[in-house]
Each structure stands twice: as structure tokens, then as C-alpha cells.
Amino acid sequence: MFKDYKRMFRFDTETNSLNPEPCGEILELGGILLTKPEGSDKFSERQDISVLIKNKYPLLNSDIHHITAEMCQGNGVTKEELFELLKGIFGDYSDTLIVAYNSPFDMKFVRAFMEEMSPGYKITNPVLDMLEVARDRTGLYRGNKLCDMIVRYDVKDVENSHRALDDCNALLGVMRAMWKEKPDIENYIRK
């Protein structure tokens, strides 16, 4: 699976709004970075990433993701630290596949953030949106939330909690189940 890629970054964001403009920000970024060791065709090295970000705007939607201002201020990384982390993942790696559930939402926040930190910065990695796969599999436009896919594919031992790393683990389970159902997921990659 995914033979053209040396790394795969499955990620999710929790945000304080639905749009990055005028003052929407990433509150939390979670991800699972999978790497193929040299000479291998299987992803076997895993790095879990979970960071809260120190923000200047008020937190909204705390009732959904349960992230508080105190959590971000006390345990959060600076925007500069997040930028360096993401640059190391997205960087100049055309062999790193980016995977998300509803990737247009997450990517618009990440792109806006990277552009804010470094004007002109472009993310050029190939992207796989698993929501697009889910819509094709169900034949429905609505009713394809990640929690719906967890139930549909009977994925065990995962939680869709609206916390970024939990949702990445759920995505990993759903993605494996979808691959077993029909191994055509690579056809959905947008370069």
C-alpha cells in the first residue's frame, strides 16, 4: 500500500472557528507520522505527535473538543515551534503523503498558518481525503462523519473524541478497514 511514499502523515486539527480568517486558529494538532525504513516497502516506524498551541484569540467550541485556554497557555507550544514541526513534516518531501478526514478543512488552517509564519510558503505534498473515500463507499454526501465510519466498519478500541490524536488513531483504524473492503484508496490521492 502506498508504494510511492516514504512517509505518511495522518493528522487532525482542533480549531477555534470554522475558518482561519479573520481570527481562526489551530488549537491542537495531532498526527501519526509513519515512515518506511530504508529498503522496506512497509510503514513500520511510528511517531505520535500531539501539541496544543498558545493562542491569542478566545477559545470557542470548548464544549466540543474540551480544550481550555488554560491547557493551551500552560502546555502549548509557540507558533514558532509549531511552524518548525510542520516544516519538518511537509518540507520538501514530495514522498510524504498527507492524510486527513475532511482534509480541505484541516489543510486550509495549516496552509493559512504556514503562510502567516512564512509569507509565500506553499505546501505541495500529495493529500488523501478519507472523507471523499467514505462518501464514495456509502454513496451519501451526508452522514459520513468519522464517528459514523467507526460504527460502519466496526473499528474497535478507538475513540472519536474531537481531540486531535484520538481522531488520528480512529482514522487509522477506519482507513485500514476501508482498504480491506476495497484496496483502491490510492486512487483518491490528489497531487
Question: Which functions belong to the PLM regions below?
Answer:
Residues 1-3, 152, 172-191:
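Acidic two-metal-ion nuclease catalytic site recognized across multiple nuclease folds
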Residues 2-124, 139-162:
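Conserved non-catalytic scaffold segment of RNase H-like nuclease domains
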Residues 165-166:
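Acidic donor-binding loop at a coil-to-helix junction in glycosyltransferase catalytic cores
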Residues 144, 169-172:
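A structural signal for well-ordered alpha-helical segments within the folded catalytic domains
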Residues 121-135:
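Conserved beta-strand -> loop -> alpha-helix junction used to position metal-binding or nucleic-acid-contacting
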Residues 109, 132, 169-170:
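Hydrophobic side chains within alpha-helical segments
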